[in-house]
Amino acid sequence: MSTCGSLENSDIQVQGAENGGTSQKGENPVDEGNVGETKSGDIKPAHMDEEPKKEEEEEEKAKLQASTLDDGVNISRIIERLAKEDPQSLAKIYSLMKSNNCLNFYPLLTPYHNIERIVDILIEENYEHENTWCVHCDAVFICQLLYEGFIPVASKQKVCRMVNNETKVVKECLLIPKIHYVRSCMHPSEIHISRKVKKKCKSYYITVDKDFDGVLQGIVEKHGQNWLYPFVQKEFKRIFEEQVTYKNVRMHSVELWCDGFLAAGEIGCTVGSIYTSLTGFQRKNCAGTIQLCALAKLLQHQQFDLWDLGMLLPYKKTIGSKEISMKDFFKMHRVFKHKTAPFRVPFQDKLNCGILINGTEDVRPEVNAEMHSE
């Protein structure tokens, strides 16, 4: 279900897109050449009036098929709505498609789509890629994507734009919501914890939602902006602070501390009893693994049913993550997102990772004393 054919077959002409936008259907005349005579035994060539008739039949067939689609997945109707209600975004869509041919082969998503139905279609078509794309990068739409099981990452693509009567190449922001043909997931109880982690974890504390900005800074410091561009950070922060809410989607930060130093952390989100790890960092050797192991125990303690780790990578497999097909993932996701699970450090604002990972035994005496004093 590529974007290319759907948009090019639309009758809408975009105001504001380069070169007057995309041509309307039927604008180019049909070439009419001389048709040879039919001889006995020869293949009969099409008559001059049969080609337009064939095109009309195909057009009517396409319209009939389109009329059976829900408005939430009918791209022609969505384009009509965009043209009336959000022409600036529609012009941006055409400009990006014109300058970046690869976008023609990925599904376009907008706030006007029925996202759940789009997922069903991708599963039915056995969609083997991981990318979709959209130009709407606001917090509300990001929440909607998270609720439906997408992992929204950001990108910047080159487009040509007229500036002071000169054509200039600029970079346009867009989202690349990931759907993943194979997902890395696990139940929190399936975590694999090494002896090294069990030994080192006693010196670390875990917190939740204590330093969102610090975690963002750590991620950019470690990985560069990568996909976490400033405009995405801004929208994530709005979701985190609940300036924007959508159903039960919540944005969180997880911090790992060592002697007051932020040693590792991640940004994640919860939807019902599902926790999704979005991106993270570490500043000390092994700190990232300790943070993940402590997080798994925290999720298990608070009865989360699914830990979504996104794309499968070797380190995720090492801690126990499994490969799950797109179909199976969304089957589980649509059940667990309607359940309830709290996400916080229990009983206090911070917790020693030795307590979470090893239990109350084999923890430094001062930690035991602290726990009993709470």
Identify the meaning behind each predicted range.
Residues 2-11, 25, 31-33, 39-374:
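N-acyltransferase acceptor-side catalytic subdomain
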Residues 20-21:
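Asparagine-rich low-complexity intrinsically disordered tracts
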